[in-house]
C-alpha cells in the first residue's frame, strides 16, 4: 500500500510540474506574440532602451526638414538624437531621453521610429537578409513650416499656445507652445548634464516643459459659447431667435450677479447679436434653459471627455456634471469647472467649419521605411458629427458676423471669409484673465485656436481680441 501511495503522490507531483511548465510556456508565448510591442515600447524596459540607443532611429520631418534625427556618435551609445529648432517643435516631436523616456511623437510613434512596427516587417526582413543593422522608419508630419513659424513668432514674449488644423482632414498644420524647452538638453548622452537640465526645467516657474497646446487644459471662457450656441441651434433655435439678455443676471438660488463686458443692446437680442458681442447673461440663461444634459452631450460630440485615437498626446478636456443651475449658467459661458486644451477648442472650430463633421486630428501623414518605401499612410477619419449641416452653416454665418461686426474684428483678412469667437476666462480676482481666440477661414481650410495666459493687457483689449485674433490671422495668412 505504501508503494502504491508513493506512486500516486509522484504521479500528482509530476502532473503538477507539467502543468506549471505548460502555464509558463503559454505565458511566455503570449508575451512574445501579443505583448511584444507593449513591452518593447515601455520606456522603463532598460534592455530595450539600451538597444534603442544603439540603433539608427528614424527622422521626424516637417516638409523636407528633419526636425528630429539621429546622427552617428562616438559616445556611450552608437547614435545621438538631435533636434533642429528644438523649442519651436518640442510640442510636436517631444523628447527622447535615456533617463526620462519619450513624449509626443517620439512616444506615440515609437514603433515606427524604431522600425519595430507591423508596417515595417518586410523592411526588417530584407534588412536582416542583407546583413544591415536595424534602422527605424521616418515620419512625414502634417505640419506646415510657415504656419508653425507664424504661430511661434506670434507667441514671442507671451505664455500660451496656438493650434491650427486643416478642418477638412484633421491634419495638424501648426502646434506651438511658449515658453518651451530644447529637447537636445534631455537627449544628450552626457547623462549627468541631462539630469541637471531636467531639474532646472522642472524648477523653472514658467513651466517650459508644459505642452500648453495639447497637454494642458484651461477655462475656455467665452469661446465655449460656440458649444452653447451649437446646442441651441440643434434644439430649435435659429440665428434670429430672440434670447433674453439683461444687463445683470442673478444666478439661480444665489445672490451672485453675472454681468456683461459691454451693453448687450437690450433686454432681448438675436442669438447672432449675442454671439457678436459675447453677451454673458444671454448665454448663461440660454444654457440653463437648454439643460445640463443637452450641453454635456454637445460638448461630448465636440470631443470633451475623450481623446482622439491618433498619434497626438492630448489631455482630456472636461465639462462638469451634477450641476446646480448657478453652476450650469457659469459653465454655459466656459467658466466654473469647464476646462479645455487649445487643441480641443481648435477641434470645436473645425467641427463647425467642416459643416458639422469633426475629423480626427493627427500629426503623421505617412511613414517611410529604411529602404525609402512608404509603408504606411494616414486615412482621414471622421471622429463625430457634432451638428447637422444646416446648423453648422448657421453657426458659420454667426461666427463670420463676430469677425465682421463684433469682437473678432482683428482677425479680418481681405478677400478671405473668416469666422471666429473671442474669449476671456477669469482664473482668480488678483490675476488678469486668460485670452482666447477660436476661428476658421474658408481659403485656406484651417481652424485655429490661440490661447494666451495672464498678461498685462487691459481686460477690455483681451475681450476685444487684441491678443489672440492677430496671431490667428497671421497663421491663416501664412497658409495662403
Feature-to-residue mapping (PLM):
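Beta-lactamase-like hydrolase cores
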Residues: 45-49, 144-162, 179-189, 297-298
Amino acid at each position: 500500500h505504501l508503494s502504491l501511495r508513493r506512486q500516486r503522490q509522484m504521479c500528482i507531483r509530476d502532473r503538477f510540474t507539467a502543468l506549471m511548465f505548460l502555464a509558463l510556456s503559454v505565458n511566455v508565448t503570449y508575451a512574445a506574440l501579443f505583448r511584444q510591442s507593449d513591452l518593447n515600447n515601455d520606456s522603463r524596459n532598460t534592455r530595450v532602451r539600451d538597444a534603442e540607443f544603439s540603433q539608427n532611429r528614424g527622422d521626424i520631418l516637417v516638409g523636407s526638414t528633419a526636425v528630429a534625427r539621429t546622427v552617428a556618435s562616438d559616445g556611450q551609445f552608437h547614435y545621438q538624437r538631435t533636434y533642429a529648432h528644438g523649442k519651436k517643435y518640442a510640442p510636436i516631436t517631444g523628447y527622447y531621453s535615456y533617463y526620462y523616456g519619450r513624449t509626443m511623437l517620439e512616444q506615440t510613434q515609437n514603433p515606427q521610429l524604431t522600425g519595430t512596427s507591423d508596417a515595417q516587417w518586410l523592411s526588417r526582413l530584407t534588412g536582416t537578409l542583407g546583413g544591415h543593422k536595424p534602422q527605424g522608419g521616418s515620419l512625414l508630419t502634417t505640419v506646415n513650416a510657415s504656419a508653425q513659424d507664424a504661430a511661434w513668432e506670434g507667441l514671442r514674449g507671451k505664455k500660451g499656445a496656438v493650434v491650427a488644423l486643416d478642418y477638412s482632414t484633421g491634419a495638424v498644420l501648426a502646434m506651438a507652445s511658449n515658453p518651451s524647452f530644447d529637447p537636445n538638453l534631455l537627449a544628450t548622452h552626457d547623462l549627468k548634464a541631462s539630469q541637471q537640465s531636467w531639474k532646472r526645467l522642472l524648477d523653472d516657474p514658467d513651466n517650459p516643459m508644459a505642452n500648453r497646446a495639447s497637454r494642458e487644459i484651461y477655462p475656455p471662457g467665452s469661446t465655449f459659447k460656440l458649444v452653447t450656441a451649437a446646442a441651441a441651434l440643434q434644439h430649435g433655435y435659429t440665428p434670429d431667435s430672440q434670447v433674453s439678455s439683461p444687463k445683470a443676471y442673478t444666478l439661480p438660488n444665489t445672490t451672485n450677479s453675472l454681468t456683461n463686458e459691454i451693453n448687450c443692446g437690450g433686454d432681448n437680442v438675436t442669438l447672432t447679436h449675442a454671439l457678436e458681442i459675447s453677451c454673458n447673461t444671454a448665454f448663461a440663461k440660454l444654457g440653463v434653459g437648454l439643460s445640463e444634459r443637452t450641453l454635456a452631450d454637445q460638448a461630448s460630440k465636440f470631443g470633451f471627455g475623450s481623446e482622439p485615437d491618433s498619434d497626438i498626446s492630448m489631455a482630456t478636456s472636461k465639462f462638469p456634471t451634477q450641476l446646480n443651475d448657478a453652476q450650469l449658467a457659469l459653465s454655459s459661458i466656459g467658466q466654473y469647472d469647464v476646462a479645455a486644451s487649445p487643441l480641443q477648442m481648435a477641434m470645436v472650430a473645425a467641427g463647425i467649419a467642416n459643416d458639422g463633421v469633426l475629423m480626427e486630428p493627427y500629426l503623421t501623414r505617412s511613414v517611410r521605411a529604411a529602404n525609402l518605401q512608404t509603408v504606411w499612410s494616414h486615412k482621414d477619419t471622421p471622429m463625430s458629427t457634432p451638428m447637422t449641416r444646416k446648423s453648422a452653416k448657421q453657426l458659420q454665418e454667426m461666427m463670420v458676423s463676430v469677425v465682421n461686426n463684433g469682437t473678432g474684428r482683428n482677425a479680418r483678412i481681405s478677400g478671405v471669409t473668416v469666422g471666429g469667437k473671442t474669449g476671456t476666462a477669469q482664473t482668480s480676482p488678483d490675476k488678469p484673465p486668460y485670452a482666447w481666440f477660436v476661428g476658421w477661414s474658408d481659403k485656406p481650410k484651417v481652424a485655429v485656436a490661440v490661447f494666451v495666459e495672464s498678461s498685462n493687457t487691459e481686460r477690455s483689449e483681451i475681450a476685444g481680441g487684441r491678443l489672440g485674433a492677430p496671431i490667428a490671422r497671421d497663421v491663416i495668412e501664412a497658409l495662403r
